[in-house]
Design a protein with these regions (language model features):
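Membrane-embedded transmembrane alpha-helical bundles that form the catalytic cores
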Residues: 1-156
Length: 156
């Protein structure tokens, strides 16, 4: 385990932006767990299937509509343009949420717990609440590494 702790090249390129202390603290726990725990693997695969469904079935299908509208915007009326914009908004959400969900599931199979990254942002009642629910780990990163060091308060 000390070899794993010394290697600082553990990078997750999709999903939540996790704090290193959260991941490192879980490395010690992995040695206490069975290498393959059926319930953990099953839960991880369910997360991954949900993520693949969001990406392949929803996001990619909605992208066809959004792309068509944006590629030929000049030949459509207001209603279709609004529909294209709504489709694009859901495509973006489903793309981001699917990558995060797949990453959470694959990490869970390996014994790691990652934070949820989206909390139904399109049901927010304000822009502030939307941003709090959208890409949560990115917002926390901006808060902890930019906003607070530049003089912001922790209560904001």
């Amino acid at each position: 385990m000390d070899k794993l702790r010394k290697k600082k090249k553990l990078i997750l390129v999709a999903g939540s932006i996790e704090r290193s202390k959260n991941i490192l603290s879980q490395i010690d726990d992995i040695t206490d767990k069975k290498l393959l725990n059926f319930d953990r693997v099953k839960a991880g695969f369910i997360y991954m299937i949900r993520g693949f469904f969001l990406k392949i079935v929803i996001a990619d299908r909605i992208a066809v509509i959004a792309d068509e509208v944006f590629n030929r915007y000049y030949s459509y009326g207001t209603f279709v343009l609004i529909l294209g914009a709504v489709c694009f908004a859901f495509q973006i959400y489903c793309d981001f949420a699917s990558y995060s969900t797949i990453a959470i599931g694959s990490a869970q199979i390996m014994g790691f717990t990652l934070m949820e990254n989206f909390e139904t942002p399109y049901f927010a009642m304000s822009i502030k609440e939307f941003w709090r629910r959208w890409h949560i780990s990115l917002s926390m990163w901006f808060r902890d590494y930019l906003y607070i060091p530049l003089g912001g308060t922790r209560k904001a």
